[in-house]
Regions:
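Class I (Rossmann-like) S-adenosyl-L-methionine-dependent methyltransferase catalytic domain
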Residues: 1-51, 55-108, 122-209
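A conserved beta-strand element that flanks and buttresses the S-adenosyl-L-methionine
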Residues: 114
């Protein structure tokens, strides 16, 4: 089983979250591309949603306040999960998973996986495994939706790691149909023109099914 890189393990992330200024990609709120997507989701359908590597999980908080009741937050580090529990006391505790995303069993099936700064936080060598695991955890017809950095961070030896849309397309193409895969039009100002908004759908018959 391929798991999170030893270099960026639970202790590494716990230390980063505990050190002021070392989670520089943390926007402090749900970013506009995802907020716009969440606002048009039908609450009545109550999809099962996974947010892996969620960090402080502003997206989970936003979805919870919209009325979504089956949002699962997964993270290697306990600190951000505890922060979410304190910030949103009525968020279901059983949906706060202190776990390695790559170790999640495929019997866990979701309708939607949200990507927000997890892909850029894993060792780039794990990106093919990330795409494969997302597909395995989605029901047929399920979607992977989120934002990816469409820029390189020169000399990066630790997260965040950048990349290009051509690189990303190669990872996801074996498992997903591309509904949307283009520059986000409503990014935060510091990220404008440097983010891709993606909406990828697992086909009814998938190699990761």
């Amino acid at each position: 089983m391929q798991t999170v890189s030893d270099a960026f393990d639970a202790a590494y992330w716990q230390a980063r979250y505990a050190t002021p200024g070392r989670a520089g990609w943390d926007a402090g709120r749900t970013t506009p591309p995802l907020r716009a997507y969440f606002d048009q989701l039908p609450v009545a359908q109550q999809p099962r949603i996974l947010i892996p590597g969620a960090g402080r999980a502003y997206e989970a908080e936003y979805l919870h306040r919209l009325g979504f009741r089956h949002v699962v937050v997964a993270d290697l580090a306990p600190e951000p999960l505890a922060e979410l529990a304190a910030r949103v006391p009525d968020f279901p505790k059983e949906n706060l998973w202190h776990v390695d995303f790559f170790a999640l069993h495929h019997r866990e099936q979701f309708d939607l996986i949200i990507e927000q700064t997890f892909f850029c936080a894993i060792d780039p060598s794990l990106r093919p495994a990330y795409a494969r695991q997302c597909a395995a955890l989605l029901r047929p017809g399920g979607k992977l939706v989120g934002v990816l950095f469409d820029t390189a961070f020169a000399g990066a030896s630790e997260p965040p790691f950048g990349g290009s849309r051509e690189e990303y397309r190669a990872y996801f193409a074996p498992y997903f149909q591309f509904i949307h895969f283009d520059t986000a039009h409503n990014s935060l100002a510091p990220r404008a023109g440097r983010e891709l908004f993606i909406c990828l759908q697992k086909p009814a018959a998938s190699p990761a099914a």
